A protein has these predicted regions:
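Glycine-/small-residue-enriched transmembrane alpha-helix faces in small-molecule transporters
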Residues: 1-37, 142-169
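Alpha-helical transmembrane segments of compact multi-pass small-molecule transporters, enriched
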Residues: 19, 42-46, 100-114, 129-130, ...
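Helix-helix packing/entry segments at the starts of transmembrane helices
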Residues: 13, 36-38, 82, 96-105, ...
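Hydrophobic transmembrane alpha-helices of multi-pass small-molecule transport proteins
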Residues: 47, 111, 120-140, 149, ...
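Specific transmembrane alpha-helical segments of multi-pass solute transporters/efflux pumps
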Residues: 15-20, 48, 52-95, 101, ...
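Transmembrane alpha-helices of multi-pass small-molecule transport proteins
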Residues: 29-80, 107, 159-163, 180-198
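Structural signature of hydrophobic alpha-helical transmembrane segments
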Residues: 31-43, 87-104, 146-158, 204-218
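Hydrophobic/aromatic residues within transmembrane alpha-helices
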Residues: 26, 35, 39, 88, ...
Length: 349
């Protein structure tokens, strides 16, 4: 399962990475609110066919246990964060913004430890430190405007950090459902606001391209990220997702012919090393699971998934998703802070 989670995390970074240079181009015909709205409406469009399936569990996102999480996901991740990002993108080159976006990893890690019971080992903390150094190094190449952009994008990353943890803990809802709700609500609100405050007519030729970018970079990318986060934890998934700048920087050089700066080279090397060191080990200790019910993609290959399907045993290697119950169990094995391992570690420190 961890191997699949690593692959989906890397793919989510690739898809999101291409959004930065394309978004900078689209801002020529759309304001920040309009573009943010269209990007998330594209995400909702990508997930729309899935909502007709019986296991979408849309109503579970609005039950008492998930209502506050869902509201936070929409507000911080779907509304506030993209606006701050696009504001920062206006006054800095796309390559630098792509690298700064990895401050989301730092925000996710700190919030995870302080609030969301995310246990981090020394390798993960090293990855966080390297990411901070990469972001600071990039700022040196941008001058004063880089400071303003860096602050705006850091604020966006804090919002996405909150979104990441709330999404990873949204119990009972599939990644596709979370993406659809965030996309349809945040997308509609942002786009309407953008049209109301617009100082010039909307450039209709930019609408379709913005939606297409949203389908891939905000739709499929979010689903892949959520799948990864629910299996190895938000912080570790964010480290994999932080490969996004590699693709954003490359496309920025291709589309905008931005100068190849030494600070970008150093930052990319630091980020690559951060991804490697944070995926070395999982920690191991004796822990107890209480009874739980939720939905996520899984195989029947561990002690957490031994349930039957209509009285029948499912093939161990078959991937599937449905609402299921976990029985209480106490055991010891290597694990990451996934949906099943959000226990406290105070006694171990």
């Amino acid at each position: 399962m961890k191997r699949i989670a690593i692959i989906t995390g890397l793919l989510s970074g690739l898809l999101f990475g291409v959004a930065t240079p394309f978004s900078k181009l689209l801002l020529n015909g759309l304001n920040s609110f309009q573009l943010a709205g269209l990007l998330y409406l594209g995400a909702a469009l990508a997930m729309f066919p899935y909502m007709f399936k019986k296991n979408s569990n849309l109503k579970l996102l609005f039950q008492s246990g998930n209502r506050a999480k869902t509201t936070g996901i929409i507000f911080f991740g779907g509304f506030l964060a993209p606006l701050l990002l696009l504001a920062g993108l206006k006054s800095a080159n796309a390559a630098s913004v792509s690298i700064w976006l990895n401050m989301e990893l730092v925000a996710t890690a700190i919030l995870g430890v302080l609030i969301f019971k995310d246990s981090l080992d020394k390798y993960t903390w090293l990855g966080v430190f390297l990411t901070i150094i990469a972001g600071v190094t990039t700022s040196f190449g941008e001058g004063f405007s880089g400071i303003t952009s860096g602050l705006l994008i850091t604020a966006a990353c804090i919002c996405w950090g909150i979104d990441n943890h709330l999404t990873a803990l949204a119990d009972g809802a599939s990644p596709q459902t979370v993406t659809f709700i965030k996309g349809i609500v945040a997308g509609s609100v942002n786009f309407i606001i953008g049209c109301l405050i617009a100082t010039q007519p909307i450039h209709f030729g930019s609408i379709a391209p913005a939606i297409v970018v949203g389908v891939f970079s905000y739709g499929f990318s979010i689903v892949l990220y959520v799948t990864s986060a629910q299996n190895i934890g938000a912080t570790r998934s964010q480290i994999l997702f932080s490969t996004a700048p590699l693709w954003g920087v490359v496309l920025s050089y291709i589309f905008y012919h931005e100068s190849f700066q030494w600070v970008h080279v150093i930052s990319i090397v630091l980020l690559a090393f951060a991804v490697i060191v944070t995926n070395i080990l999982s920690h191991k200790h004796k822990h107890t699971h209480i009874e739980a019910e939720h939905i996520h993609y899984h195989q029947h290959t561990d002690e957490h998934h031994i349930h039957l399907h209509g009285g029948k045993i499912v093939s161990r290697g078959k991937w599937h998703s449905h609402f299921h119950t976990h029985e209480p169990i106490t055991h010891e094995h290597p694990h990451d802070p996934d949906l099943h391992h959000r226990h406290n570690h105070e006694k171990l420190l």
